[in-house]
């Protein structure tokens, strides 16, 4: 059984406004992709498994449901918000953190994520072997 509903007018208006901003201010998109490339490079260089992500939304593969919850909580205590994705949303051995990059992020903020993950890796193994 499938249920479909049209988006609410305020959602449609928000989407249209976002598209208008993107069209009028291409520097925002450029900054988003610069930040995306920066974080992808840093995560890969540091040895974290991010799969084949090509978007500003990165999976950081943890592959253990319990570890995902622990790491997300540790990051939150450091002021870094991530989303844990675990079974049944993904296969049992594909548990991950989801990190979203924004155009408004500064490199220092992205570096703070890397530093926090490196600190956590000392206690909970999360880097690729």
Q: Where do the language-model regions lie?
A:
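PLP-dependent enzyme catalytic core of the Aspartate aminotransferase-like
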Residues: 77-81, 89-129
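Conserved PLP-binding catalytic core of the aspartate aminotransferase-like
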Residues: 30-39, 44-79, 89, 93-94, ...
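PLP-dependent aminotransferase class I/II
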Residues: 1-43, 48-51
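A general structural signal for well-ordered alpha-helical segments in protein cores
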Residues: 12-15, 68, 110
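Alpha-helix N-capping/helix-start residues
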Residues: 9, 26, 65, 107-108
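Beta-strand->loop->alpha-helix junctions that form or flank phosphate-binding loops
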Residues: 6, 83-88
């Amino acid at each position: 059984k499938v249920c479909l509903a049209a988006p609410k007018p305020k959602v449609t208006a928000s989407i249209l406004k976002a598209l208008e901003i993107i069209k009028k201010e291409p520097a925002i998109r450029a900054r988003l992709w610069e930040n995306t490339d920066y974080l992808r490079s840093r995560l890969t260089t540091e040895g974290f498994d991010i799969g084949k992500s090509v978007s500003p939304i990165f999976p950081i593969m943890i592959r253990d449901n319990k570890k995902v919850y622990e790491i997300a909580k540790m990051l939150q205590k450091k002021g870094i918000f991530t989303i844990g994705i675990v079974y049944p949303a993904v296969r049992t051995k594909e548990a991950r953190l989801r990190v979203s990059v924004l155009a408004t992020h500064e490199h220092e903020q992205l570096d703070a994520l890397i530093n926090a993950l490196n600190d956590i890796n000392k206690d909970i193994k999360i880097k690729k072997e």
